[in-house]
Amino acid sequence: MSSVIVKENETLDSALRRFKRNCAKAGIQQEIRKREHYEKPSVKRKKKSEAARKRKYN
């Protein structure tokens, strides 16, 4: 879980910006999108295989 302690004399905007940066580094948005809908194991394997194929040829 990402958390940010607001420092003294720090604006809310800069604290929010730091929080968003921490969330992006932790990969929270990608994880939420990935878990939004159930994905069958066969579909997961297919996506994993396609990603490996893309990495190999690019």
UniProtKB/Swiss-Prot annotation:
Which GO BP terms, alphabetically? translation
GO MF terms on file?
A: structural constituent of ribosome
**Matching PROSITE patterns, A to Z?**
RIBOSOMAL_S21
Q: Does the keyword Ribosomal protein apply?
A: yes
Q: Where is the composition biased (Basic residues)?
A: 43-58
Q: Where is this region: Disordered?
A: 31-58
- State the source organism's domain of life: Bacteria
Q: Name one Pfam family in it.
A: Ribosomal_S21
Entry annotated with the keyword Ribosomal protein: yes
GO CC terms, sorted:
ribonucleoprotein complex; ribosome
Question: What NCBIfam families does the record tag this protein with?
Answer: S21p
Which family, according to UniProt? Belongs to the bacterial ribosomal protein bS21 family.
Name assigned to this protein: Small ribosomal subunit protein bS21
What species was this sequence derived from?
Answer: Agathobacter rectalis (strain ATCC 33656 / DSM 3377 / JCM 17463 / KCTC 5835 / VPI 0990)
